[in-house]
Amino acid sequence: MGASDIGEMTSGRDWQARYPELCARAKGTNVNDRTLLATDYLNHVNEIIMLLELVPDAPECLEDCRAWRPMSYTEHFEASSIADRDLAIEAYEFSPPEFRGTFDRLIREMHRVIAGALAGLEAATAQGDEERARRVVELAVRALKTMVDHASSTIHGDAQVMDQAEIDGLMDMM
């Protein structure tokens, strides 16, 4: 990907000057010094995974699931208290497109899976269908954990990414 493509993704900022500076600042922090992404964001998704897993045996946890809201990467870190939150927010804009593009796509798909799971749980609960609720949770959690693993790999700079066909396959299971 060329510098002009990267420049477009970073709102026209001087990526070539800022990227090396941010990589240097990221060393020894919670922000990956190559991808400029931080795994702490995945805690937000892991929270809803944990809540979803509780619902079949503790239906009252559905209320907690309803209260959960998707957050963008920046929103998550703005609400975070981790020491490197300001760096995480600043560096995100300069994450190379081969990482950030994949990461952002995975996050969008995770949010879509979560919305579908919540809708499925609502319907199953309204009908008193515990078996269907378990199946919805099982499929959603499996898909979400796979996507979280891929997002984590992306954050750590693994070039192997989940292609759209793999994501669609997970979605078809739901």
Where are the predicted features?
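Alpha-helical repeat scaffolds in large eukaryotic proteins
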Residues: 49-56, 115-118, 122, 145, ...
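Eukaryote-specific, cytoplasm-facing alpha-helical/coiled-coil scaffolding segments in long proteins
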Residues: 70-80, 133-146
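Acidic, low-complexity proline/glycine-rich segments
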Residues: 2-26, 74-78, 82
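Glycine-rich, aromatic-bearing surface loops/beta-hairpins
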Residues: 141-174
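Non-transmembrane, amphipathic alpha-helical segments
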Residues: 26-47, 54, 60-68, 88-109, ...
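Charged/polar, low-hydrophobicity segments characteristic of intrinsically disordered regions
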Residues: 78-92
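Amphipathic, heptad-repeat alpha-helices with coiled-coil/zipper character that mediate oligomerization
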Residues: 65, 71-82, 98-120
